[in-house]
């Protein structure tokens, strides 16, 4: 047993993991009937098969539970591929267990991270964009239209370190042993 994410009287997610085999399983459980159906069965160390995390929202009691809209849940994943990391949002029909990819980040010189689903019905999400030289900034993005609007404009506070480069130092110790180090 690894945890339960409650949804409503018809749906909850139950996870189990086994350390020795690195196997993790997730089931859609009907709490009312006790019927469970397997939706994820994978090696926890296989980043390419990572389905992501289910989107949670506050319920009427102020508790975060699985967001369910017309028997559908939404998953945000890191999207590792052989070509790079392309975060995604996927819709899972909890009745049929069919998946539908709603959004996948495009290849860019900036790394995109999905921070939050704001309104899945409208397609509004919050993302973060950054690079090796550009500090992370937040954007409101609509996955239906593709439009995005900058929310923050934080300048890299470490700009003075941008010109710093690695250097390998080679030297000889007093006893004659050659040593090297990266500075």
Describe the predicted segments one by one.
Residues 78-79, 89:
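A cross-family structural signal marking well-folded subdomains
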Residues 72, 90-91:
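A general secondary-structure boundary signal
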Residues 81-83:
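Long, low-complexity regulatory segments enriched in Ser/Thr/Pro/Gly and acidic residues
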Residues 43-49, 55:
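Blade-loop segments of beta-propeller domains
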């Amino acid at each position: 047993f690894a945890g339960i994410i409650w949804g409503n009287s018809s749906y909850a997610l139950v996870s189990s993991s086994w350390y020795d085999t690195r196997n993790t399983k997730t089931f859609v459980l009907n709490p009312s009937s006790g019927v469970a159906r397997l939706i994820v069965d994978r090696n926890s160390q296989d980043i390419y098969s990572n389905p992501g995390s289910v989107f949670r929202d506050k319920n009427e009691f102020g508790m975060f539970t699985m967001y369910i809209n017309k028997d559908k849940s939404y998953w945000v994943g890191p999207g590792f591929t052989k070509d790079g990391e392309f975060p995604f949002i996927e819709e899972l029909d909890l009745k049929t267990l069919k998946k539908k990819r709603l959004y996948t980040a495009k290849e860019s010189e900036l790394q995109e991270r999905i921070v939050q689903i704001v309104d899945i019905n409208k397609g509004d999400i919050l993302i973060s964009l950054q690079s090796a030289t550009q500090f992370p900034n937040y954007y409101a993005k609509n996955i239906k239209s593709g439009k995005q609007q900058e929310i923050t404009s934080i300048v890299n506070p470490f700009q003075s370190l941008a010109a710093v480069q690695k250097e390998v130092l080679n030297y000889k110790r007093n006893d004659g042993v050659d040593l090297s180090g990266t500075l």
